[in-house]
Structures are given as C-alpha cells and as structure tokens.
UniProtKB/Swiss-Prot annotation:
Its EC number is 4.3.2.1. It comes from Leptospira interrogans serogroup Icterohaemorrhagiae serovar Lai (strain 56601). Pathway: Amino-acid biosynthesis; L-arginine biosynthesis; L-arginine from L-ornithine and carbamoyl phosphate: step 3/3. It is found in: Cytoplasm. PROSITE patterns: FUMARATE_LYASES. This is Argininosuccinate lyase. The keyword Phosphoprotein does not apply. GO terms for biological process: arginine biosynthetic process via ornithine; L-arginine biosynthetic process. One of its GO terms (molecular function) is argininosuccinate lyase activity. Belongs to the lyase 1 family. Argininosuccinate lyase subfamily.
Length: 470
C-alpha cells in the first residue's frame, strides 16, 4: 500500500503530502489517549450499521473481534504507530482493514471524522471526569477527617492576611470542604454537554443513510441526541464547560496551597509539613521547602491558560468544523493530567500536616485577635453603643502596641484609664482565646456546637457523594 493510498482522503490527490504537512498535521502523539473511546464509538457505530442493513451479522462479528484485538495490542504496547497515519482514528481503521480486509472498510459508512472525533472526546470527558470526581470526593473525605481531628485546635483566622479572630481549625478545613462540594457539582453540570450524542452528524450536514441515532445514544449510555448536525460537529462547549470546572477547582486548590505555604513558614508557623512532602536546598542546609504546594500553585496557571487557549481559538472560527479544533485536545488532556496529580498532592499534604497550637496561641495574642470579642462584651453586657465600644477597644489596642504588650499582659492601671470595664474576670473572659470561638453561635459559625453540627452535615454530604460516584 502506497503512502497516498493510506490516507483516508487519498483518492483526490496526485501528490504525496509534504513533510511539513505531515509534521504539523499529526496528532497521534497526543490523541492516542482516545483509543478506548474511539473503539467504543466504533463498536456502537458498527452495531447501528447492522441495524440498518449496511453490515450483516458475520461482518459485525469480525469488526468487533478485530477491534477487541486492536485494543489489546494498544494496551500491551504491541501496536505499531505510523507517522503517515496522522491520528488514532486513522491508525485504528488502517489496522482494522489489515486484520479483516474489505469488511473493515465498511465501518466508516455514514460517519465522518468530524462527528467521530467530537464523539470520542465527549466520551473521554465522561470517563476521565468520573475519575476526577472520585479524587475530589477523596479529598473532601480527607478534609472531613482532618476537621474532625482538629475540632479543639484554635488557630488564627485571617482577613487581609492579618490576624482577625480565633477560629477552630475544623472551621478552616470545612471551608474548603464546602468549596470542593461546589466543584463537584460544577463537574456534574459540565458533564451534561458531553452526554449529548454527536455521532451521526456526518461532516456537518447529516448523512445519506437512515441511521438510528437513538440506538447509538443507548449503546453509548448517553442522555440525548444533538438536534442539529452542524452544531453537533462544530460545538466545543463540552470541552469549554469541562475546562471551566477544572479551572474553578484549580483556583481553590491553588489557594489551599498558598495557605499551606504561608502557614508552614517561619513567620506564621501554625502548621508543619512532614519531611517526606518537602525538599531542602542545595546550598542552604536549614531549608525545608513546601515544593508540592508551590508546584501545584504553579500548575493552576496552566489549567487557567488551557481554558484561555480554547476560548481564544474558538472565538473567530466560522461554521462549522475547522482544523484549528485539533488543538482542543492538547488543552483538555493537559488539564486532566494536571488536575489529577494536583488533587493527589494536596490530599497527601492535608493528611500529613500537623497543627502547632502553641504557635497559633502566640500569634493570636500578639495579633489582638479577641479585640472584637471585647467590643461585643461592652455592647452586650454594658449596653455601650457599638461605635463607642469600637473606639474604646481601638484605643486599648493602640496603648498595647505602644507599650509592646498584649490584651493579656497590659497592666490593669493602663486598662482602667481607658475604661472602667477593662478589669476583673469579666475582662479576662471577654479576651479569652479559648472562649472566643465558642461565642460564635450563629449557624455556620466556629463555636464547638456549630462545628459539631457542621461536621454532621458534612458527613451526610460526603456519604451522598460517595453513593453517587464511588
């Protein structure tokens, strides 16, 4: 077989493809990942062709057996790739024809690579997306377990990267638990676009055969059939929506990594990462670097970039299919791999880190973290207007800063000079770190009672997710 004859479109051309066309047009270096989905779609298509009389039972059996052999060859590393065959779809069809001859050439009846490729990608998103969902649920499970263990650990809560108020560590961990629940639901929503059957749309106008697309939908386990063949082959909304979900997830993961980097630094020091998840320096022997967190933070930019790449590529394309769309898979494949390894890395860090509560206590005291509690004490117990209370406590903090003291060790005489209420057990209770968190009794707050309540709700949410996806 000559090179020209190997091309699926070779009949029209009198010259072989140039070297640069081969090099710039090949996609087998990355779209080989679609082999399972391509074979899955081809088997469904072959069964449909049998339904409408294009194939007989013997031919269908030959095709199914040969496709199963090709799948085995690919998985065992015995499949021979040829640079002139461009992509995984041509490779599989060429090998099929090698195995069963003319019968193999019938498989592409009523099918274009345009609808074939977009269908493969939709199936790939569904298959890989389920794995990402499992990883999200596993990460949520790790956050839940860590939160349960951290219920009695008090750490600083921050706004503007400055110490704000004491919180239970469980409150912090559960804040990411709920963010990841939204990511989980975003992926579920994104899957809907991939659950639409594109196969049967042909090149773009439909096909000249009485194909049974409802049959194909059921064979592939999809939920609906694309109502318009032009939209079916040209839309990449299924990839866009999936990458939007990946991007939101990676933004959350990157922010967790930023917290880990900060909180494990000498300046903060409220958590410690295990040695196995950190690295040293080639010149500075004292260093213990949170490389995994930094690398994941960096990888988040790649996923955001992949989404932007696809958005820019799509914005100026005319209807319907254009070869530019070959580039969509690079963005998709890279995002999937990046998300998966990032979820693994962040999970190990969460499971492995240790809180350092004594350092957290020092930070809370030095950061005047219970100043708001003191103001609320004046409002609730002494019936002082909040703005007046705010001013009194602000003055107290100013004196502490000037004298390099805290709310706990500033002499009573200095406190009384500001307010007669800044004395005795009432004052001590008002600024107490241990009591502060339990004063936050509003729903969703950081009091122990509300945290126990939230842990129960979180467990119910986790069980429901595991029931649906694991």
């Amino acid at each position: 077989m000559t090179e020209k004859e190997k091309k699926l479109w070779g009949g029209r051309f009198q010259e072989n493809a140039s070297s640069i066309l081969e090099r710039i047009g090949q996609s087998i270096s990355f779209d080989h990942k679609l082999y399972k989905e391509d074979i899955q779609g081809s088997i469904a298509h072959a069964r449909m062709l049998k339904q409408i009389g294009i194939l007989n039972s013997e031919e269908l059996s030959k095709i199914e057996i040969a496709l199963a052999q090709i799948k085995t060859e690919l998985e065992e590393g015995k499949f021979e790739f040829k640079s002139e065959l461009e992509d995984i779809h041509m490779h599989i069809e060429f090998r099929l024809t090698e195995l069963i001859g003319e019968t193999g050439k019938k498989l592409h009846t009523a099918r274009s690579r345009n609808d074939q490729v977009t269908q493969d990608v939709r199936l790939y998103i569904l298959n890989q997306g389920k794995e990402i969902l499992k990883s999200i649920i596993n990460l949520r499970s790790s956050l839940y377990q860590k939160a349960k263990q951290s219920l009695d650990v008090i750490i600083p809560g921050y706004t503007h990267l400055q110490i704000a108020q004491p919180i239970r560590a469980s409150q912090y961990l559960l804040s990411w638990f709920w963010a990841l629940e939204r990511d989980q639901e975003f992926f579920r929503f994104a899957f809907k676009a991939s659950e639409e059957l594109a196969l049967g749309s042909g090149a773009m106008a439909g096909v000249n055969y009485p194909t049974d697309r409802e049959f194909l939908k059921k064979e592939l386990g999809l939920s609906k059939v694309s109502p318009n063949s032009m939209d079916g082959v040209s839309s990449r909304d299924h990839i866009l929506e999936f990458l939007f979900a990946c991007t939101q997830l990676m933004i959350h993961v990157s922010r967790i990594c930023e917290d880990i980097i900060l909180y494990s630094s000498q300046e903060f020091g409220i958590l410690k990462l295990p040695d196995s998840l950190t690295t040293g320096s080639s010149i500075m022997p004292q260093k213990k670097n949170p490389d995994i967190a930094e690398l994941i933070r960096g990888k988040s930019g790649r996923v955001i970039g992949n989404l932007n790449h696809l958005l820019v590529m799509l914005k100026g394309l005319p209807s319907t299919y254009n070869r530019d769309l070959q580039e969509d898979k690079l963005a998709l494949f890279d995002s999937i791999e990046t998300v998966q390894i990032s979820l693994e890395g962040i999970r190990e860090m969460i499971e492995g880190w240790i809180w350092i509560p004594e350092r957290a206590e020092v930070s809370l005291k030095n950061g005047f973290a219970t100043a708001t509690d003191l103001a609320d004490f004046l409002v609730n117990e002494k019936k002082i207007p909040f703005r007046t209370a705010h001013e009194l406590v602000g003055t107290l903090v100013g004196v502490c800063v000037k004298q390099k003291k805290t709310l706990f060790d500033l002499p009573e005489s200095d406190r009384v000079s500001i307010s007669k209420y800044f004395v005795g057990k009432e004052y001590e209770d008002a600024v107490s770190l241990s009591l502060s968190a339990d004063k936050k009794i509003s729903y969703g707050g950081t009091s122990k009672k509300r945290q126990e309540e939230q842990l129960k709700i979180a467990l119910d949410s986790l069980k429901e997710a595991e029931r649906l996806f694991l």
